[in-house]
Amino acid sequence: METETATTPTGNTEPTAAASAEPPKSDKVTVRLRNIADAPVLKNKKMVVNPTDTVASFILKLRKLLNIQANNSLFLYIDNTFAPSPDTTFETLSRCYSVKITDKEILELQYSITPAYG
């Protein structure tokens, strides 16, 4: 790591670390899925997604896994209460709604093919 010097407001010079060229390593987001009502059951209920993935892209992946056609609905819910916006990233959802289970942060989502709440 290279060091540079910076001048403080009092006129002294202090060594500072140069900015790293690599972006900070982003962790994956672990998602646990649970079906509601008459939605098909997934074989693997845990998925790992990139934090930059959006809810809309995740719904497309989930549609393929569940063999749900484009003309049928698929609803996602958080905490059995509300649907996240399609343009929300999993980084935001994870920061706000993840729960800690055995030293791992897990985002719990519920899915349904019919409106379940409201």
UniProtKB/Swiss-Prot annotation:
What GO terms in the biological process aspect are recorded for it? autophagosome assembly; autophagosome maturation; autophagy; autophagy of mitochondrion; cellular response to toxic substance; determination of adult lifespan; glycophagy; macroautophagy
Q: Where is this motif: LIR?
A: 90-93
CC terms in the record's Gene Ontology section = Atg12-Atg5-Atg16 complex; autophagosome membrane; cytoplasm; cytosol; phagophore assembly site membrane; transferase complex
Residue stretches of biased makeup (Low complexity)? 1-23
Question: How is the protein disposed in the membrane?
Answer: Peripheral membrane protein
Positions of the site: Required for interaction with lgg-2?
D87
Q: In the UniProt record, does the keyword Membrane occur?
A: yes
Where is the protein localized? Answer: Preautophagosomal structure membrane
Residue segments, region Disordered = 1-30
**Could you tell me the superkingdom of the organism this chain comes from?**
Eukaryota
Which UniProt key words apply to this protein? Autophagy, Isopeptide bond, Membrane, Ubl conjugation pathway
Q: One Pfam family of this protein, by short name? A: APG12
**Is the keyword Nucleotide-binding in the record?**
no
One GO molecular-function annotation for this sequence?
protein tag activity
> What is the reported phenotype of gene knockout?
RNAi-mediated knockdown causes no visible phenotype, but animals have a reduced lifespan. Accumulation of pgl-1-positive P granules in somatic cells. Reduced lgg-1-positive autophagosomes in seam cells. Delayed removal of paternal mitochondria in fertilized eggs. RNAi-mediated knockdown reduces autophagic degradation of membrane pore-forming toxin Cry5B.
Entry comment, domain topic: The LIR motif (LC3-interacting region) is required for its interaction with lgg-2.
Please state which protein family the record places this protein in: Belongs to the ATG12 family.
Quaternary arrangement and interactors, per the entry?
Answer: Most likely a component of a complex at least containing atg-5, lgg-3/ATG12, atg-16.1 and/or atg-16.2. Interacts with atg-5. Interacts (via the LIR motif) with lgg-2; the interaction is direct.
Function, as annotated, reads: Ubiquitin-like protein involved in autophagy vesicles formation. Conjugation with atg-5 through a ubiquitin-like conjugating system involving also atg-7 as an E1-like activating enzyme and atg-10 as an E2-like conjugating enzyme, is essential for its function. Most likely a component of an atg-5-lgg-3-atg-16 complex that promotes autophagosome formation by associating with lgg-2, but not lgg-1, at the preautophagosomal membrane. Probably, as part of an atg-5-lgg-3-atg-16 complex, required for lgg-1 lipidation; the complex acts as an E3-like enzyme promoting atg-3-mediated lgg-1 lipidation.
List the PANTHER family hit by this protein, alphabetically.
AUTOPHAGY PROTEIN 12, UBIQUITIN-LIKE PROTEIN ATG12
Q: What is this protein called?
A: Ubiquitin-like protein atg-12
Q: Which gene encodes it?
A: lgg-3
